[in-house]
Amino acid sequence: MLNKHYSLADGCSLTVICSLVVWMLVAVCQAVYGKDVYPKQAVEIAKKYITLSRDVKAQARAKGLRPAALAPYYIYNDAQDKGFVVVAGDDDMGDVLAYSTEGTLDTLQANPGVKLLLEAYRQTYDVLKEGRVMVQRKARSGLFSKTVSPLLKSKWGQSHPFNAQTGYPYSGCVATAVAQMMYYYQWPAQGSGKNEYRVTYYNTMKSADFSQSHYDWANMLPDYNYPVSATKEQEDAVALLMNDVGVASFMQYTPVLSGTQGIFANQALQKNFDYTAAYVTKAVEGPTRFAQILRQELLNGCPVYLEGRPAGNASGHAWVTDGFDENGLFHMNFGWDGQGDAYYSLTNLSLSQTGSEFQGKPLAFNRAIMAILAHPNNGKYPAIERGLLESSPQLMFNEGGAVLLKDAEDKSFLASQSLTIEMNSFVNKGKPFKGDVGIAVYDAKGTCRQVAYTDGHAIGGF
């Protein structure tokens, strides 16, 4: 937290008018508590998306409205295996948390990305029940007039043939997510630079000269699953790409899984594969802004890399979001040979308050999602928003940020009055710098009247 003291010049005054705005927001966004969703109600919601078997309907009727029948969410598979739907157990989470028009959802066999989201839904439900969180109804209602159908056509995974040139059992979820995005763009034709590092588990060195790699996009298939019979050239093409992405992002391989950090993938895209990229986190941007960024990228025709980590567990999963529907649910491609690919809710993981049990603090699952925005440098796509790039130095408040006028009454004060201002929870999203942070005071005409610096300005700031 920074404390700032300043005195305004004679003849200048500052009045912050906010009461009217606050009153209007209260009028249109009334906070209310959600209602439990029972199996019988959940079935009625599910019927709008899929065809249910008679047994499922009968079971729901039998459970009735007993409290013991309540659940954080209800999973229903289509009677003909033509999709599934996940219905929320509390209507403050929305009606539907996920749905697909193909395949089924088996929680025992679900990929890590699906399990991560389902666990996050469970945590959200628990917070709603234990903390009695108030949710803004207005914020979660309304339809989107523009939608984006899934951009990716690929259904890639981590085993054969994707791991064929890595020398290890799994290519890694980070490499699979990035490679699928690159396949969508068919870029670049050739890599650049080199990388070498140690694979810790095996205590061996792994390296690659990307300038020697020519990516055969035309020979890569969108789907290598049975009954597809790929040629050796088609398998080699995707295996080379997957290995290069893994090496460029310092992939750590083990017999049971392979993983790395998204920040390394972000750097690799720029350094080795000729992309402009931005690393964006939900914790810094805030849930509403984060979702807006994702939607705009998708509207621009650009899929987005996502990475999530469950609370209390360092191991996460990386995948791609490549579309969204009229209700704001995002389509996820989990890089698991198509398994679990569907529309999922991200917004219900965003709670503005968490109740007295959690001292009103955002929980881990609200902060644990980050994104990589990546655009090929081929001139075919709109530029990434400049303010999101690391090359655009800027300070910004994160979701808990605030500016407080400590000593002012009624948000106004005399021009000659010395005033203490406190700012907290802001971050530097750009390059590191050494300096100071100040506050500028503008009059009603937009003229800068005075600039005030921190108490430590005389000794060099921070």
Would you name each region that the model predicts?
Residues 35-48, 159-218:
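Active-site nucleophile-adjacent alpha helix/oxyanion-hole segment immediately C-terminal to the catalytic cysteine
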Residues 72-140:
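Autoinhibitory propeptides
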Residues 355-420, 443-447:
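Short, compositionally biased P/S/T/A/G/V-rich stretches that sit at domain boundaries
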Residues 88-104, 327-346:
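Catalytic Cys-His active-site segments of thiol-dependent hydrolases/isopeptidases
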Residues 438, 445-462:
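Solvent-exposed serine/threonine-rich low-complexity stretches and specific carbohydrate-binding patches
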Residues 60-82, 267-333:
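Active-site-adjacent substructure of cysteine-protease-like catalytic cores
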Residues 33-67:
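Short, non-transmembrane alpha-helical segments in secretory-pathway proteins
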Residues 15-28:
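Bacterial N-terminal signal peptides
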